[in-house]
Amino acid sequence: MKKLLRLFFPLSLRVRFLLATAAVVLVLSLAYGMVALIGYSVSFDKTTFRLLRGESNLFYTLAQWENNKLHVELPENIDKQSPTMTLIYDENGQLLWAQRDVPWLMKMIQPDWLKSNGFHEIEADVNDTSLLLSGDHSIQQQLQEVREDDDDAEMTHSVAVNVYPATSRMPKLTIVVVDTIPVELKSSYMVWSWFIYVLSANLLLVIPLLWVAAWWSLRPIEALAKEVRELEEHNRELLNPATTRELTSLVRNLNRLLKSERERYDKYRTTLTDLTHSLKTPLAVLQSTLRSLRSEKMSVSDAEPVMLEQISRISQQIGYYLHRASMRGGTLLSRELHPVAPLLDNLTSALNKVYQRKGVNISLDISPEISFVGEQNDFVEVMGNVLDNACKYCLEFVEISARQTDEHLYIVVEDDGPGIPLSKREVIFDRGQRVDTLRPGQGVGLAVAREITEQYEGKIVAGESMLGGARMEVIFGRQHSAPKDE
């Protein structure tokens, strides 16, 4: 059962369109049909009344008043089997003349009807109607079919009442004309039955037209789906921007996404290439050290720090490239709130272990209220690179201070090292540029730090420290949306 449902649900756009339009057509057809039928019924009643009134006028002209009695002489050309029956009453409601003697029908005429012109209906048993129309064989066959379906069925007869005022030759008369053929057997009544057939035929004709309309209307979507399949099969690079107005925005955004993903792929590929290139130097140093050990030119104790330093460098480079490869331009920055002091404590603790032999003395002057708004890894990456450089080039002391405004976070790192020449203070942030080429490094740490701070609309400013070395001021922007502690 579930497999069968999956074949039909969720419904395709074409099926949804067909069902919706078919429902609209059905409702409108029913509404228009009902209005037409009701209008036809009203028109039919008026037409029937006019015909019966004409019959009444005919009998009024044939009527003669002699010796206080009413005489009606029917011409020979009048069909005695006429589908109407005429009754003539005086002003007191007394029956003066009847075309035929049908007692049950005469009893159905209400006295109130005789007072004014009007159109009425009477209900008769199907057997009584059959006796009334005993001379019409075709009607008898139809009544027999009705009787077979429902022996207690009732037939409806139309009645027209016309009042004629008194004249010099004729007293006031009321002529009642009864249509002996039931409304149910008239062809006009069959319109209700034919309506179902017409509606069905209408739907059978409309649905194919709706299918064609759906096919033509949804062609742009089918073309888009085809292009997406070609993308999956790597047979095209972008979607065709020449599409309908409604799909233009979707196609444009999808093309942007495709370009972004392609750029990301290119970035991964470039990152792998850069990583491979950056590992050549530490690997070459490791190979050279191993050869020296094998030839006993270097002792294990002398080789160990060199190898550990290179292994550490390899680990740092791998971590750096993995992190950078996962970053995407235009990505929304996290708005998480992180206290600065604990993050810097963790970093300085790790750096003290790394530079334990050097004996670096790191001091922190950070207020507990100062916080960073953003991704924690970004903060650690930036400050890790800046502090690593400070520890690497300092003689002994590294000082860290911070301050915060509504819009920015300022962190200052100072050391007592050789400092940075004025001419190099901008170059050091370029990828691959280094001030001291004698020390190990790839010249990417500060470049990475600058790229991350620029994502926060910030920057890193290199200057001269009061300690005699370098002063690096790291500025993080986008701090105005920081949530406030309650």
From Swiss-Prot:
The gene is phoQ. Residues 215-266 form the HAMP domain. The keyword Zinc-finger does not apply. InterPro entries: HAMP_dom (IPR003660), HATPase_C_sf (IPR036890), His_kinase_dom (IPR005467), HisK_dim/P_sf (IPR036097), PhoQ_Sensor (IPR015014), PhoQ_Sensor_sf (IPR038429), Sig_transdc_His_kin-like_C (IPR004358), TCS_sensor_his_kinase (IPR050428). The chain crosses the membrane at residues 17-37, 195-215. One of its GO terms (cellular component) is plasma membrane. The lineage of its organism: Bacteria, Pseudomonadati, Pseudomonadota, Gammaproteobacteria, Enterobacterales. This is Virulence sensor protein PhoQ. It comes from the Bacteria. The record marks 202 as: Plays a critical role in the switching between kinase and phosphatase states. CDD domains: HATPase_PhoQ-like (cd16954). Residues 274-480 form the Histidine kinase domain. It holds the Pfam family HATPase_c. The modification Phosphohistidine is found at residue 277. It is found in: Cell inner membrane. Its EC number is 2.7.13.3, 3.1.3.-. Residues 38-194 are periplasmic. A divalent metal cation binds at residues 151-152.
